A protein has these predicted regions:
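Extracytoplasmic/periplasmic solute-binding protein
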Residues: 7-20, 25, 49-100, 139-141
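A bilobed periplasmic-binding-protein/Venus flytrap-type ligand-binding module shared by bacterial periplasmic
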Residues: 28-31, 184-197
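Long, aromatic- and glycine/proline-rich binding clefts that accommodate carbohydrate-like moieties
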Residues: 166-170, 219-277, 281, 306-314
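Periplasmic-binding protein-like
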Residues: 162-190
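Hinge/lid segment of periplasmic solute-binding proteins
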Residues: 1-25, 40, 49, 77-78, ...
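Paired acidic/hydrophobic, glycine-rich loop segments that form the ligand-binding mouth/hinge
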Residues: 140-145, 164
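Glycine-centered hinge/linker elements that transmit conformational signals in sensory
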Residues: 51-54, 96-126, 168-171
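Short amphipathic alpha-helical coupling segments at ligand-binding clamshell hinges
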Residues: 107-114, 187, 196-208, 216, ...
């Protein structure tokens, strides 16, 4: 597994699940349309804005996901987008002791301004079906989970060979390197506390999450379903043995190595809810980004504090 892959399942010194699958956002672009317009895929956000300008002048647009949720991972894509920008700016999602969010930090505020600015300043759509718009060419650039590859490979044969997936854009350092972290989510295995056969259950979990079982499972699914069944194991060794092309594998590994994992805390359900509320207030109601984020951040942290008291964690 990746070094911090179990972080979402850890709390207060305990680990409550074992990673099974993993998914993270990458950048998709239509190579045919980019070639026609003389564009190159953006590596930084400045380049992204330049590409968006050209696309919009040609009655096209780009897709930055907002209020959607990926059913296969349960990962909230809008939370992911904010967390991506926050990580790239060097900020933290939570304080070190996990007692409060860090959205009121300078990096947190700047990331929120940038996130909402995609829609309020650059006019990008905040509700869209990326698969269909990407297929038709209306949205030849966008960010989505790498498992969307399965759907594109199976259900969009008319654009086969006309698209690629790359790491997402980032912020450029003074030395020319790019900070393009993304966030990862996935599914996990767990054992119930009152299981009758804990040793046998653990043996199964240990076996099924191992290299050979994960490779066999992934290849078996793909042999039945074709590319639509391409498996996304959290086991890195198993991933390396699945039938990705060399270029696809290199691009995915480059992004995977820069994945950030978000901790889960009691009251964490208030994070998604209030980030969404703050987003709507700014993008739809034209409220001030900084003041709006700080107001909703207080509500988030009040709920986290309330749940910590309820569970006697303080």
């Amino acid at each position: 597994f990746q070094p911090n892959a179990a972080l979402p399942y850890e709390f207060n010194g305990g680990c409550y699940a074992s990673p099974l699958t993993e998914d993270f956002p990458v950048m998709y672009y239509r190579t045919d349309i980019f070639e026609e317009l003389g564009l190159t895929p953006p590596k930084t956000w400045e380049e992204f804005y330049e590409v968006v300008s050209v696309l919009q002048h040609n009655n096209m647009t780009a897709g930055v996901p907002n209020m959607q949720e990926d059913d296969t991972t349960g990962m909230s894509v809008y939370t992911a987008m904010y967390a991506i920008l926050l990580s790239q700016m060097g900020g933290s999602y939570m304080k070190d002791d996990l007692t409060a969010t860090y959205f009121d930090s300078p990096e947190g505020v700047e990331a929120f301004k940038m996130w909402t600015g995609f829609y309020s300043m650059y006019g990008l759509p905040y509700q869209f079906d990326f698969f269909n718009r990407f297929r038709t060419g209306e949205m030849p650039l966008g960010f989505a989970a790498y498992t969307i590859y399965n759907k594109l490979a199976m259900s969009a044969p008319e654009i086969k060979g006309m698209w690629e997936m790359l790491p997402i854009p980032g912020l450029e350092n003074s030395d020319g390197s790019i900070r393009n972290q993304t966030v990862s989510g996935g599914m996990a295995m767990l054992m119930l506390k009152n299981t009758e056969n804990p040793e046998q259950a653990w043996d199964f979990m240990d076996w099924f999450s191992g290299d050979e079982a994960q490779v066999s499972y992934g290849l078996a699914i793909e042999s039945l379903l074709g590319a639509a069944g391409r498996y996304n194991p959290a086991n890195r060794n198993a991933f390396l043995r699945l039938p990705w092309s060399v270029k696809q594998q290199q691009n995915l590994l480059e992004q995977w190595d820069k994945c950030v994992y978000l901790p889960q805390v009691p009251g964490g359900y208030f994070i998604d809810r209030n980030l969404t509320n703050a987003f709507r207030q700014v993008v739809i109601m034209n409220k001030n980004p900084r003041e709006t984020l700080l107001d909703y951040n207080k509500e988030i942290n009040q709920e986290i504090s309330r749940k910590r008291k309820e569970f006697h964690l303080d």
